[in-house]
Each structure stands twice: as structure tokens, then as C-alpha cells.
Amino acid sequence: MAIIPLAQLNELTISSSSSSFLTKSISSHSLHSSCICASSRISQFRGGFSKRRSDSTRSKSMRLRCSFSPMESARIKVIGVGGGGNNAVNRMISSGLQSVDFYAINTDSQALLQSSAENPLQIGELLTRGLGTGGNPLLGEQAAEESKDAIANALKGSDLVFITAGMGGGTGSGAAPVVAQISKDAGYLTVGVVTYPFSFEGRKRSLQALEAIEKLQKNVDTLIVIPNDRLLDIADEQTPLQDAFLLADDVLRQGVQGISDIITIPGLVNVDFADVKAVMKDSGTAMLGVGVSSSKNRAEEAAEQATLAPLIGSSIQSATGVVYNITGGKDITLQEVNRVSQVVTSLADPSANIIFGAVVDDRYTGEIHVTIIATGFSQSFQKTLLTDPRAAKLLDKMGSSGQQENKGMSLPHQKQSPSTISTKSSSPRRLFF
């Protein structure tokens, strides 16, 4: 429970008046719906007019006590499907992602033994006998159909369901669309966060991934696809293959955590589930941007890196909805939150539905993390980015140069150095997928 002196609270609301967007968000989400004055509690639980009057007088010198947690939080479940999805779930668990129920779904019984999820679920026992699908998406789909009741039971009671998987294999590609259909038919907000395979994994795997993504798109509210090839732009040339796949798992984690933290972690700016649902319900293809900085101008740099990474010049301007999360340590200031918000809102379409959260986490002292989910893109736009890297690079250049021209800004858009992969680097990092 956060305790904020009343005088400090007044200063906070006054000082933020220069930014109507930020003031509106704080007043409508944090202060209006989540703050409970200590004097109100005293009046409620102690009888007698004179007693209440006395207590009210005494409470003037008291601090304002605010609870930033809703009485009943949204129930969030993360479903890792197949080997890639199971690995991503393990990564999320080891990173300390909280207030989320984790499930691991697989046809391979041995793989499930390696899962850290508290809820492992083997599917297609009669069909595959626990031996996997051999990379055949059709078997993955049939296995999920065989275990539909078990999957539906696992999803029961959800508000938000994340389905994470590596596209291109058998179980992930085949079963993930079935899991998504069960979730969406039940009325849960369903978000897919999946990877598209590296080019070196072969054409067959890429084609299977595209087919799976098309099926998945029809059964989710929002779909975030992360092309693994883009990780090559930020990874050191000496990065071991195993570490490259770990990096892919970590990007999946950031996509899930960027959304779930907004809902579940008590923050400076509190956003409820209904806000997130308004932006992500039936919103189609989405893109993920991440910026991290610990420099002197960390707020601006983290925001710029999250928004000016490849394709953001085109992407955020044409997005119908934007969800972004600002995370920092106890040293993060209101002005820094305001500066991040100014960067994002200046680049977004004025008609876009924009919501954001600001979270304090001791683990991020000295750093500011900005995660952006931009929604509302067509499936054809996404397919172009996945299948035509040259077109993607062209859009990147056009977006970057056009952004600087149109906005009158001279923002850096440089190729990442290998050192930026370190989470403790003083220079900003960026990812956008």
C-alpha cells in the first residue's frame, strides 16, 4: 500500500496540469478509482457524529492513504504451446513475472517434464502417445482437438489469455490456433504472442509458420508476431546459437509482461482491465516495441528507442490503438513519465485509442523501460513484413526519414552496437517487431 503526503499529492496534480493527457490518466485511473482516504475509513467504521467530526479534524494532518490495487484483479493465464511456447513460459517464470497463471501444453511428455509451469497439460495422448508430432502441424491440430475438453477446463475462469508459441513446428503451429479458438469462443480476451522462425531454419518451417499464423489470426483478438531474424540486428556476431533462441524467448516474455504488468502491478498510473480490453479486443495484428535506457536523458531515449525502432515511423502512425507501459525504480519522476508520454503521443495518430501505465519496480532502479503495443494493422501488412525483408527495410528507411521530416526532429536512428544487448548498459536499447 502506497502512502503519499496530501501536500505532495496536491503538488503532483498541479504540476502535471501542463500535460492534459497525463493528468487525465492519473486522475481518472489512480486517484478517482483507487485512492481511499484514511478519513473516509475512520468515518465509515466509527459511529457518532461528534466522533466523526473529531476524527475528520484530526485527519487533516494525516497522510492520504491510497491503495492502487483493485478489489478484484483480472485473472490472467499464459498458455505456452509446443516446445517454443514451453521455453517462453519457463523464461517468464524465471524472470519473476507475477500475478499470472502459467500453463504448458505439449504432445511430448518428456518436454513437459522440463517445464517450470505449475499446470502442465499433455494433449493428444491417444494420437501421439506422448512422443510429439515430428514437426507435423496437422498432428498438432488433431492432438488439440482430441483434448479440447481438457484445454477448455484449463482456460475456465480467465479474463485474459495469452497464447505463446514458436510458429513453424508441429505442436505450436497446429495446436495454438485450436487453443485460441477455444479461448475466444468462451469470451476471454485472447492475445497471441508468437515467433516467426529464423531464415536458416528452412523454407518448409517458414511456410508452416505462415499457415499457422493465418489460422491463429482468425481466432485471437490481438496477434503479435516476432520475426526471429530481427534479433540478428541486436545480437552480437559472436552470440551462441542457444543464446539467440533465449533472446527470442525473452522477447516473448517482454510482450506478455508489458501488457500484464499494466493490469496487475500497482502503479503510479493505474490502468484497469477494461481499458486494456478496449484497445486490444478484435484489434487484429499488433507490433511490439521495447526501449531501455539508464543514461542522463533516459526517459526520452527509452521512448525514442521504443518508437523509432524499425517500422515504427509507419506503424505507430497507422495504429488504431496503442498500449504502453513505463517501468522504473523508485527514482523515476513524474516529469520523466510525462516526457515518455509526450514522445509517444506526438507520434501516434490523434484518433488512436491510447492507454498507458506507469509502474515502480525496485529491480529497475537507475533504468527506465518502455514497452509499446501498437494495434490495428491488417494481416496483409504483417505478411509483407514476414515474407519480404527488402520491403521491410524500405519501410524502415522511409519511416525513419519521414518521421524526422514531418516532426521536425533530428532523432538518432543508428545501428545497434553489440554492447547494447546488455541489460545494464548506459546506452539505450531498442526492439520493434
Curated annotation (Swiss-Prot):
One of its GO terms (cellular component) is chloroplast stroma. Residues 414-433 have a biased composition (Low complexity). Residues 399-433 are annotated as: Disordered. Residues 1-66 form a transit peptide. Keywords: Acetylation, Cell cycle, Chloroplast, GTP-binding, Membrane, Nucleotide-binding, Plastid, Thylakoid, Transit peptide. Changing D159N: Forms long filaments with impaired midplastidial localization, heterogeneous chloroplast population, one greatly enlarged with numerous smaller chloroplasts per cell. Transmembrane segments: none annotated. GO terms for molecular function: GTP binding; GTPase activity; identical protein binding; protein homodimerization activity. Pfam families: FtsZ_C, Tubulin. Changing G366A: In arc10; forms long filaments, heterogeneous chloroplast population, one greatly enlarged with numerous smaller chloroplasts per cell. Disruption phenotype: Highly heterogeneous chloroplast population with giant chloroplasts and some smaller. Impaired chloroplast division, some green cells with one single big chloroplast. Abnormal thylakoids. Increased plastid volume in young leaf primordia and in the shoot apical meristem (SAM), including the central zone as well as peripheral zone of L1, the outermost layer, the peripheral zone of L2, and the peripheral zone of L3. The keyword Lipoprotein does not apply. GO terms for biological process: chloroplast fission; chloroplast organization; chloroplast relocation; microtubule-based process; plastid fission; response to blue light. The keyword Membrane applies. PANTHER family: CELL DIVISION PROTEIN FTSZ HOMOLOG 1, CHLOROPLASTIC (PTHR30314:SF12), CELL DIVISION PROTEIN FTSZ-RELATED (PTHR30314). NCBIfam families: ftsZ. Belongs to the FtsZ family. Exhibits GTPase activity. Component of the plastid division machinery that forms a contractile ring at the division site. Required for plastid division in a dose-dependent manner. Involved in epidermal plastids division in a MINE1-dependent manner. Involved in blue light-induced chloroplast movements. May regulate thylakoid development. In the vegetative shoot apex, at the shoot apical meristem (SAM), where the proplastid-to-chloroplast transition takes place, contributes equally with FTSZ2-1 in the L2 layer to plastid division. Aggregates to form a contractile ring-like structure; contraction of the ring was accompanied by an increase in the filament turnover rate. This aggregation is regulated in midchloroplast stroma by MIND1 (repressor) and MINE1 (promoter). Self-interacts and binds to FTSZ2-1 in heteromers to form two morphologically distinct types of filaments, termed type-I (smooth filaments) and type-II (rough filaments), in a GTP-dependent manner. Interacts with ARC3. Part of a complex made of ARC3, ARC6, FTSZ1 and FTSZ2. This is Cell division protein FtsZ homolog 1, chloroplastic. It comes from Arabidopsis thaliana. The lineage of its organism: Eukaryota, Viridiplantae, Streptophyta, Embryophyta, Tracheophyta. The gene is FTSZ1.
